[in-house]
Amino acid sequence: MFSYNRLLFLIDHLIWGILVLVFVFFIFQSEYFLTERNISNILTAAAVLGVLVAGQTFVLISGNFDLSTESTLGLAALVGIWLIVPAGPTTFGGGIYMNPYLSIICSLSMGALIGYIIGCLITYGNMHNFIVTLAALLVIRGLMMAFTEGAPVSGFNNPSADVFYWLGHEKAFKVPGLGKISVAVLATGLVYIVCHLILKHHKFGRELYAIGGNRDAAEALGINVNRRIRQVYMLSGLLAALGGWMLAGRVVSIQSNLGETFIFTVFAGAVIGGVSLQGGRGTMLGALGG
């Protein structure tokens, strides 16, 4: 007998069957599709979006959504590079000469801080998540434009910026049939493993499903809903900052429009992967496929 739970599992992960069909289609369409170099490039290009989709999945499962992801990505990367690159006429930097690894911590913290502020406005200010995150998207993008004066950020050739280049370009090892696997792909895989464990085997994940499924019932069960919402936006901001680190290192440039229009692809990836816009449903495995 086909149980209801098994049917839901198949529906949530239907994307993987579709991916197999698309994969087979392109194999017959082009002799170059299955080359190691092409597969490696596809995986590397998808790594940034994969991290953003993971963060958005947490938010969607809780019954909320985050439109500020793409702007958070850009500002966090901008802050990280500004802290380590010397100030000068040909470089963009604050002249702080911060330790590169410490600058990465600051960059990730910036993402988490933005998420926390958004969460506080939603919970303490009793404001709708659409209004707050849309405003954050526009305000942060404006700050980036003012900070950079609309010019591309240079300075990636500085040795201190190698930590950005490492995550965006460095190849970890070679896998037969898949080519050289980049550090970004490995980082994305690790993110999904950790996020899957949190959703399925941790109290935090179970409470998110409860909040997204029925907020009133979750509150009646004693779940601190507002605190979880703040935490979920912090997590989304943190993962957006990680995505910014990856993207900046891959394109070796930061512009005021870094990550622009990503939000549409991120939402599409999560929803196609079986994550409900109504909340309370979705898996990391499905989101990864999306």
Where are these regions (language model features)?
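Hydrophobic alpha-helical transmembrane segments
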Residues: 12-17, 42, 71-75, 101-109, ...
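Single transmembrane alpha-helix segments in multi-pass membrane proteins
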Residues: 24-92, 113, 120-127, 267, ...
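Alpha-helical transmembrane segments within multi-pass membrane transporters and channels
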Residues: 89-137, 289-290
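Transmembrane alpha-helical segments in multi-pass inner-membrane proteins
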Residues: 234, 240, 250-290
